[in-house]
Design a protein with these regions (language model features):
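N-terminal lobe/hinge region of extracytoplasmic solute-binding protein
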Residues: 35-85, 115
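Gly/Pro-rich hinge or "lid" segments in bacterial periplasmic/extracellular proteins
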Residues: 150-207, 214-215
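Periplasmic-binding protein-like
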Residues: 265-309, 359, 443-448
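Structural transition elements
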Residues: 294-337, 353-357
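Long beta-strand-rich cores associated with HINT superfamily self-processing modules
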Residues: 461-490
């Protein structure tokens, strides 16, 4: 988690002053990812990938399919695929590719790697989303089949995620490959060459590096960085204070979860009625206005609009009541619950950046109006709430509800889990959607999660970048960045 010292604006100014010290290689595009961990090829079975690892794996360890600049699916190791009419079988035909050591890529290699992801010992964060995968089978040397226990229309989007990137002996198949060349300390140089018959080869050369937010913003403002990836709500105010063209700041229209989840079983939040009062008295419109992200809308439901197979979720009954009236009633209810001489103090675990300060101030004001004090979690005040800020890997609504199953949350609903299990095994789309809606309604009724909006993901895009596009999954390939994007459908 990024840490922002108090004089962060001075830090950016100093970095801007010294930013021009490095000579730019005009041939390479300089891409920076916000984060402290360097970009390294990792094994997703070992657990969560850092932001820089996600970007690197997306670009050097393609799966059967991969994302294009717009977040659409394009061929990866598989040159084509076919889905059975019942949605229970995906058959992929591999291209004539090779591993970096020169060995031909065989279907049995891919089947083994994907099966390893599904094993109980795997800590791959994508494993739960693949619960409907019954078997991965190599049918011939170049044909592989993924068999499902129930239809999953979003399977291709899952297979394109960096967590399902395929590596052998620590190396992937591209499209970019690490190369040796002089580069900034901590950076990794990546190259992709596409051979063109009767024309010059297409060449992508990228220097990829991870750095703290202040450094990435300074590098971009000074012209040292062509592209910055990985921005969130927490560091967004830093960009707004820097002298950067408004057109350079780009937001991904992501789906996902951005809100508060219970951090422990005990404490005041064990009371469902108190959780409900807190949920009803947040001024989400004011929070969204303070974040000032184009297209960002306040959200009071676990599910969001536009998810696969679901109508827009019904809004809670209380949402039609003006916020002032909600607070007035909640103030009375809190005094009845606690008594005038027993005020409630809640602690929240948040990042340390300026965006989190905006969020904390808004929540403290909203809940202070009903007689509840909010403080930052520390050694004395254990967290009652913590922040969830996660982008959905696809448009599947199942991911939203399964984020709150009993195996991962301290407070949960057995009834909601049962509905999730029924949704996982349902073979009819309407039945599956009904079970997911049931699970979401149970979870919302108990206020185990307090939704605020969709996540915020931003990038800084320089003038040398022509092949960048915002997309719903916030995944950005580093090939073709210096080529103008074709219109959709071309």
């Amino acid at each position: 988690m990024a840490r922002f010292p108090q004089p962060v604006i001075l830090t950016i100014a100093v970095l801007l002053a010294i930013g021009g010290c490095r000579d730019r290689n005009n041939d390479a595009l300089d891409v920076m990812v916000i984060g402290d961990a360097a970009p390294t090829i990792a094994d997703p079975a070992d657990g969560l990938l850092s932001p820089a690892q996600q970007v690197l794996m997306l670009n050097v360890a393609q799966g059967l399919v991969r994302f294009d600049a717009r977040g659409q699916i394009e061929p990866g190791l598989a040159e084509r695929w076919n889905v059975s009419d019942d949605g229970l079988s995906y058959v992929f035909r591999l291209g004539a590719g090779k591993w970096p050591d020169g060995r031909s890529i065989q279907a049995r290699d891919i089947a083994r790697l994907l099966t390893r992801t599904l094993r109980s010992a795997s800590r791959n964060p994508a494993k739960d989303a693949l619960g409907a995968v019954a078997e991965v089978v190599a049918m011939t040397d170049r044909v592989i089949e993924i068999r499902l226990s129930a239809p999953r229309p979003n399977l291709l989007q899952l297979l394109a995620q960096p967590e399902l990137g395929l590596t052998r002996e620590g190396l992937g198949t591209g499209p970019l490959q690490p190369v040796e060349r002089t580069r900034p300390r901590g950076a990794i140089a990546l190259l992709h060459v596409e051979r063109i018959i009767n024309g010059p080869d297409k060449r992508d050369l990228v220097d990829l590096i991870a750095a703290p937010t202040a450094r990435t913003i300074a590098a971009f403002a000074s012209g040292e960085a062509d592209l910055v990836l990985g921005g969130t709500f927490d560091d967004l105010p830093l960009v707004r204070r820097a002298k950067i063209a408004r057109s350079a700041l780009r937001f991904d229209p992501v789906a996902g979860l951005f809100g508060l989840v219970l951090a422990r079983r005990g404490g005041p939040l064990a009371d469902q009625e108190l959780r409900s009062l807190l949920n009803r008295t947040i001024d989400r419109d004011a929070l969204v206005a303070a974040l000032a992200v184009p297209g960002l809308a306040p959200r009071a439901t676990l599910l969001q609009s536009g998810l696969e197979g679901l109508a827009p979720p019904a809004q809670p009954d209380w949402s039609a009541t003006p916020i002032a009236a909600r607070r007035m009633q909640a103030f009375t209810d809190v005094r009845t619950m606690t008594g005038a001489d027993a005020p409630i103090t809640l602690a929240i675990d948040l990042p340390d950046g300026p965006g989190a300060r905006i969020l904390f101030d808004r929540l403290a004001a909203d809940w202070g109006a009903i007689g509840i004090k909010l403080v930052r979690a520390d050694k004395i005040n254990p967290a009652d709430f913590k922040l969830v800020d996660a982008v959905a890997p696809s448009a599947s609504p199942a991911w939203f509800v399964r984020s709150f199953r009993c195996t991962v949350r301290p407070l949960c609903s057995i009834e909601a889990d049962a509905a999730m299990d029924s949704a996982r095994t349902a073979t009819v789309a309407d039945q599956r959607a009904a079970f997911i809606r049931e699970a979401s309604q149970i979870l919302e009724g108990k206020s185990f999660f307090i939704p605020l909006a969709a996540p915020v993901r931003w990038s800084l895009v320089g003038t040398r970048i022509e092949g960048f596009a915002e997309n719903i999954v916030a995944r950005h390939p580093l090939t073709g960045l210096n080529e103008r994007l074709k219109r959709e459908g071309q």
